[in-house]
Amino acid sequence: MEQALTGEAQSRWPRRGGSGAMAEAPGPSGESRGHSATQLPAEKTVGGPSRGCSSSVLRVSQLVLQAISTHKGLTLAALKKELRNAGYEVRRKSGRHEAPRGQAKATLLRVSGSDAAGYFRVWKVPKPRRKPGRARQEEGTRAPWRTPAAPRSSRRRRQPLRKAARKAREVWRRNARAKAKANARARRTRRARPRAKEPPCARAKEEAGATAADEGRGQAVKEDTTPRSGKDKRRSSKPREEKQEPKKPAQRTIQ
């Protein structure tokens, strides 16, 4: 089956140079009514035919023949799966003449004699482009010329801020220490201030007056402790006043 299909595809290959695409046949002949896959000429682009068109067409035709041979009843889902595994994208061709963006360089494919009969547009899925730079190494591997990197810490980025904070903290501590020392000195000076010395004569006079007053009070208390009647108390009230009168000027002179 594969030999018949490959021979049929080679017989339909155009002899003109530059096109590099398979010509469409009117349909399968009466002798071989099996699955057939033919490719239409690629759509013309503004830049002209691509150099790798012939190789891509051959590759697609081989993939289609392989899918037909492996699957007894080839379906559209099976055909798409086989082509996607090889890195191609498959879309059914619509009635529009212009191909959408990204499918301008697609190869036209015609499949007949199976459940997946129809016209399809097949193109290679482009790999995502990477920005120019160093090639990434595999995880867990390091370049031989590099030394083992130390664990990075986020504190290095905050060095200027941390330096300013340290300086401000030191200034604050110095000011606090200076204030504490000044307060301690003020307390010491307050405690060590000498009291104003009084003259010795005034002190002696005050002490003598205080002792005399204490003695007079003691005598008065002793006299009061003796039991007396009401008349005696009235009589003794006058001499008490007479006794207390001479003491008042003595207290005034002491003050």
From Swiss-Prot:
Keywords, alphabetical: ATP-binding, Chromosome, Developmental protein, Differentiation, DNA condensation, DNA-binding, Nucleotide-binding, Nucleus, Phosphoprotein, Spermatogenesis
Tissue: Testis-specific.
Any one of the GO CC terms: nucleus
Basic residues composition bias: residue spans: 124-134, 153-166, 174-194
Low complexity bias locations: 142-152
Biased composition (Basic and acidic residues): 195-230, 238-248
Gene Ontology biological process terms from the UniProt entry: chromosome condensation; negative regulation of DNA recombination; sperm DNA condensation; spermatid nucleus elongation
Gene Ontology molecular-function annotations: ATP binding; double-stranded DNA binding; nucleosomal DNA binding
Region (Disordered) location: 1-54, 124-255
Coiled coil: none
List of residues that carry Phosphoserine: 56
Superkingdom to which the source organism belongs: Eukaryota
Compartment annotation: Nucleus; Chromosome
Secretion signal span: none
Family the entry assigns: Belongs to the histone H1/H5 family.
Described function: Essential for normal spermatogenesis and male fertility. Required for proper cell restructuring and DNA condensation during the elongation phase of spermiogenesis. Involved in the histone-protamine transition of sperm chromatin and the subsequent production of functional sperm. Binds both double-stranded and single-stranded DNA, ATP and protamine-1.
Official protein name in the record: Testis-specific H1 histone
Provenance organism: Homo sapiens (Human)
Gene name of the record: H1-7
